[in-house]
Amino acid sequence: MSDGPIQPPKPAVVHEAHEVDTFHVPKAFHDKHPSGTHIKDIEEYKKLYEESIKSPDTFWARMARELLTFDKDFETTHHGSFENGDNAWFVEGRLNASFNCVDRHALKNPDKVAIIYEADEPNEGRKITYGELMREVSRVAWTLKERGVKKGDTVGIYLPMIPEAVIAFLACSRIGAVHSVVFAGFSSDSLRDRVLDASSKVIITSDEGKRGGKIIGTKKIVDEAMKQCPDVHTVLVYKRTGAEVPWTAGRDIWWHEEVEKYPNYLAPESVSSEDPLFLLYTSGSTGKPKGVMHTTAGYLLGAAMTGKYVFDIHDDDRYFCGGDVGWITGHTYVVYAPLLLGCATVVFESTPAYPNFSRYWDVIDKHDVTQFYVAPTALRLLKRAGDEHIHHKMHSLRILGSVGEPIAAEVWKWYFECVGKEEAHICDTYWQTETGSHVITPLGGITPTKPGSASLPFFGIEPAIIDPVSGEEIVGNDVEGVLAFKQPWPSMARTVWGAHKRYMDTYLNVYKGYYFTGDGAGRDHDGYYWIRGRVDDVVNVSGHRLSTAEIEAALLEHPSVAEAAVVGIADELTGQAVNAFVSLKEGKPTEQISKDLAMQVRKSIGPFAAPKAVFVVDDLPKTRSGKIMRRILRKILSGEEDSLGDTSTLSDPSVVDKIIETVHSARQK
């Protein structure tokens, strides 16, 4: 008897996993490896991973003692919980970040190269050894100390991508001060807000910066910000270009004049494992940037471990991360990870397109770079520029890393074939400012990879896929939902500076007992993770997180604007692009007003946050309670007018057709 018609198989939830091949580590990777990977194979990863989840204290204690040098050993590996927001690691231990990054290598081999400075102009770079680095860090640390900086004080850093930025980080940590770096593309308003929030009294900057053949007026921006920062008593200025810059006597001091006064060595200050190492401000969905606080031992361990196992860093490697020190990628993977492991790190001041599109490949060949780490935005730009720019051997490359957003399959393949010559292993890494270091990632030379997937969890990371409606964990494979983590790990941020409740509400109270990432994700049939992007009001432009609320607040500062709504939509080059909708208090929309509003955002936040398009509309789609329905704006911009869903809850459904008309006519121009 028939059981009725045969049901067609259910389509896969994580369909991308069935649209790509699985790539194994190329044989050429192993053939050219100087000594072999740190772990044998995927089976050893699974064994270590299981230990890290089932016996985390044993696992992390062993790793900490192996990779970090403590002045005083710890007894308690971990204390606290997600529920209470009081996680602490290696509790009784004492150490110094600067000693771990510099002295222990300098004492062994002072002539070993620590920093390869690749200046904006290709012929202007230089190399700094670990011995020289220890001397420079000590002298800047003396300078800070003599200007009254004490352990626990915050120091603001607003520097371009020059070796002195790395020296400034380490000089702060040498005396137990907390560095608070602000990306040197942020506006004076953004800098002011961060300096005030962190209570920094000393700022380190340069006369100017250089990037892509252009000049950045860093000192001018600092001066503008300082007008509203009365507590700042010292601005230490590094001479990068030698340009004439405004000068405030008594407050401003030249780096080159000041550091000469001090000895070549300052003993590092021993700090507690849980003492703050740095603050880094990141965009939050409420709009006000939050100072994410990382502590010393746990953060350093995350950096060292991921450097060792994800990037397969060995002693004589020359490692090149194209990130800026103003973001977490630069903190962890330009400064801390490579220096903790004693290899050479490239500090790259320029852009991938200056003086031409072969700049990255020139650098890789020139210095025999072994690991290269960059955002998909740069890769998309270079792929589009054409393969004629890649006439380089680049046989030294073992690892090609990707950071900031998922990498599209066709870009992944181009990276593997054209850049890596099918000899290097691609590591598409997922992590956040708040996680401190990689959390879902392949291990270099070990993990089979799927283009577009971040692969498998790093040691100690236990991911959970949560149903956003019920708040329950979804078990099994081929599922999707929001991504959370089930147990603490050493490099996670401990708090938001001066706002612990905000930290709890953003990360730990959303789903009790879990750390909430704010990202959607799928777990495929093999247990591999696919990151879907933000589920809160944050857009990801060129791998940088920007708060829509912060951009909206900048637009509302313009006297003509009544209301503003900002959404991110897919962009071929930058991943997402900022698009803004505004309604005016009065008057007719003009092309000039759109330009003025984009300029307003540039001034208020920085050029990278400027909207790609500004649409002036009569009204925004709002619910009867006044909530702006950004979902509708997103769908209109994506050409999905046919699937807007139920618009009957809007206070005035007719505004939708008018917005569609505005968008269409703007795009036809």
UniProtKB/Swiss-Prot annotation:
Keywords attached to this entry: Acetoin catabolism, ATP-binding, Ligase, Nucleotide-binding
Gene3D superfamilies xrefs: 3.30.300.30, N-terminal domain of ligase-like
CDD domains referenced in this protein's UniProt entry, alphabetically: ACS
MF (Gene Ontology): acetate-CoA ligase activity; AMP binding; ATP binding
InterPro entries for this protein: Ac_CoA_lig, ACAS_N, AMP-bd_C, AMP-bd_C_sf, AMP-binding_CS, AMP-dep_synth/lig_dom, ANL_N_sf
Cellular component terms (Gene Ontology): cytosol
Keyword ATP-binding: yes
Pathway: Ketone degradation; acetoin degradation; Antibiotic biosynthesis; penicillin biosynthesis
Pfam families documented for this protein: ACAS_N, AMP-binding, AMP-binding_C
Enzyme Commission code(s) on record: 6.2.1.1
A GO biological process held by the record: penicillin biosynthetic process
Enzyme class name: ligase
Binding residue positions for ATP: 404-406, 428-433, 519, 534, 545
Catalytic activity field: acetate + ATP + CoA = acetyl-CoA + AMP + diphosphate
Chain sites annotated for binding CoA: 211-214, 329, 542, 602
Similarity-based family: Belongs to the ATP-dependent AMP-binding enzyme family.
Protein name: Acetyl-coenzyme A synthetase
Species in which this protein is naturally found: Penicillium chrysogenum (Penicillium notatum)
Gene encoding the protein: facA
